[in-house]
Amino acid sequence: MTNLRKTHPLMKIINSSFIDLPAPSNISSWWNFGSLLGICLIVQILTGLFLAMHYTSDTMTAFSSVTHICRDVNYGWLIRYLHANGASMFFICLFLHVGRGLYYGSYMFLETWNIGVLLLFAVMATAFMGYVLPWGQMSFWGATVITNLLSAIPYIGSDLVEWIWGGFSVDKATLTRFFAFHFILPFIIAALAGVHLLFLHETGSNNPSGLCSDADKIPFHPYYTIKDILGVLLLILVLTSLVLFSPDLLGDPDNYTPANPLNTPPHIKPEWYFLFAYAILRSIPNKLGGVLALVLSILVLAVVPFLHTSKQRSMMFRPFSQCLFWILVADLLTLTWIGGQPVEHPFIIIGQLASILYFLLILVLMPITSLFENNLLKW
């Protein structure tokens, strides 16, 4: 008798995706982050659902409803901090996942990569709107500053901002719609992640060598299910340690002050995972130029496959490209640090240099270095 998991219409989809999936025998722990992102998304949707049961999206009661969740709801504090720090873990996994894709040339799977870039935008939009919901000082002013950037768009800018606000300032209408979008977007992200997987399974996974692995495949279960469980346990360990020992480590103290439109915080800054993009935005004195640079800082990822000039897919055997890759990582860490600093000397010039280097590395230096390495192969 044929196994039910291979014949049942629903079970065979799960079987071909997570059980009998042929996977390369040599994929390292860098390939764990896809499953970790899935776990993060599930954690965020579940904790978010329970938070939404107690949250009120009204400017008068939003802040106190979050306080009520933390003080009066059974384990409300745990759910709230799991959700807030779960977002940080989500972004750590995202950045490592994208970094893996850049290093090993996974971007050559065009459809999978482009849906991944779309997913990155969707997750960033969701996180931004989620940060507005507690209605603290940084929530309010973050929303004001970031939505105001759209006014830089020629001709339609100011109308567009008022349309998003639902009035002439960030107010009740803005909070209500942000809550609605913040609730629906994770489900759109889950659907996109399904499409992301669908396209990935059309081609099969890449591997560290970047070579075709069709001759050497192993079943996903039990080999990679066990390997993924180790990653999940480590993720849970880090997340619970963060939540139980230092829940406010990555947050902003200003967000424990209720939103006040008449009092601007001395330093308006987003959550840590947006600081690199915020630094790029601030490094350009022109408003429209800054907005374009902000969007391009993520959108540049979509261009990477077309700038692949190397004869080898992975960076595993390309030491010069490896050097540039790690310079890029250091540059992004520098931008993250600069994004959290005040706009004054020497941070302004450091941010500008780091922003120039970021685009220069991806668009110019890496493709040229790849061509140079191609010539080295002839020696």
Swiss-Prot record:
Cofactor mode of binding and number, as noted: Binds 2 heme b groups non-covalently.
Residues holding a ubiquinone: 201
Compartments reported by the entry: Mitochondrion inner membrane
Keyword field contains Membrane: yes
Gene Ontology molecular functions: metal ion binding; ubiquinol-cytochrome-c reductase activity
InterPro entries: Cyt_b/b6_C (IPR005798), Cyt_b/b6_C_sf (IPR036150), Cyt_b/b6_N (IPR005797), Cytb/b6-like_sf (IPR027387), Cytochrome_b (IPR030689), Cytochrome_b_C_euk/bac (IPR048260), Cytochrome_b_N_euk/bac (IPR048259), Di-haem_cyt_TM (IPR016174)
Membrane topology type: Multi-pass membrane protein
Main location per the UniProt record: mitochondrion
GO cellular component: mitochondrial inner membrane; respiratory chain complex III
Keywords of the record: Electron transport, Heme, Iron, Membrane, Metal-binding, Mitochondrion, Mitochondrion inner membrane, Respiratory chain, Transmembrane, Transmembrane helix, Transport, Ubiquinone
A Pfam entry, by short name: Cytochrome_B
Subunit field text: The cytochrome bc1 complex contains 11 subunits: 3 respiratory subunits (MT-CYB, CYC1 and UQCRFS1), 2 core proteins (UQCRC1 and UQCRC2) and 6 low-molecular weight proteins (UQCRH/QCR6, UQCRB/QCR7, UQCRQ/QCR8, UQCR10/QCR9, UQCR11/QCR10 and a cleavage product of UQCRFS1). This cytochrome bc1 complex then forms a dimer.
Known role: Component of the ubiquinol-cytochrome c reductase complex (complex III or cytochrome b-c1 complex) that is part of the mitochondrial respiratory chain. The b-c1 complex mediates electron transfer from ubiquinol to cytochrome c. Contributes to the generation of a proton gradient across the mitochondrial membrane that is then used for ATP synthesis.
Family: Belongs to the cytochrome b family.
Additional detail: Heme 1 (or BL or b562) is low-potential and absorbs at about 562 nm, and heme 2 (or BH or b566) is high-potential and absorbs at about 566 nm.
Name assigned to this protein: Cytochrome b
Species of origin: Sorex ugyunak
